[in-house]
């Protein structure tokens, strides 16, 4: 994202707007040029460009907060040096909240909305999660080496990470660690030859939406009535519910050996999840940016009302 021309232009534009505002405030002139009269509109346009760059590049909003904090702090210093009370008051009003939000979001917690049903039945599409950013070490960017503390993911953690092939965050269940042998036989998972403990709960008939990709790469969807089996699964210190679709993904036993510094992840919706068994592959250690601790809201669509009946700690 930092090399995106749109992002670079928006940062330069926003900084220029701040400089023009400071210059106009210092002069205290009653004469206004075009830029002075329309500085709010111009700044808004550059702000929208910045948000657009974040959206198309799946960027981290924390970078914007960091840049905003630096700009507001520099303006505050300039205001103190020249003794201008308007600049001091205005820049302080921006710097304090932006910096506090940056620290909170970067080093403590970050909200994340689940975009798919890969973690059903426990977590569903539209759930907003609180991601603990320091679970696996402190760092400014979502990916990269932890700078201060380094704690490794544990079995059964609900992890949020950036897959190597796609800049969009994923949420999955951590199944295997570096060096582990993962084997799947009849949808039963074995780690280093030992089966992950599971207990049958019940069978349900549901309707699911399946995605299909044809030979030309076109993706289409189709609703299907299926029968699913629910299981209580216990892995590490976590106990959670998984879902298997009867008659889906029937295949020969599969086995993977996890390379050094990589992890194996799966969705709880075992037969309808893009994870380490399919296109995601092994996840590098540095690509984890947090553990999902809490569910604080569910908002299924823009025209739906959010609800809070499912709020609670994530297993």
Language-model features: locations:
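Perimembrane helix-loop junctions in membrane proteins
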Residues: 24-31, 79-83, 109, 113
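Internal/C-terminal transmembrane anchor helices
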Residues: 80-110
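Membrane-bilayer interface helices and TM-boundary transition segments
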Residues: 107-119, 133
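Membrane-embedded alpha-helical segments of integral membrane proteins
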Residues: 2-19, 31-81
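Soluble "head" domains of membrane/secretory-pathway proteins
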Residues: 1-29, 35, 71, 121-315
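Hydrophobic membrane-targeting signal helices
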Residues: 18-22, 77, 103-104, 108, ...
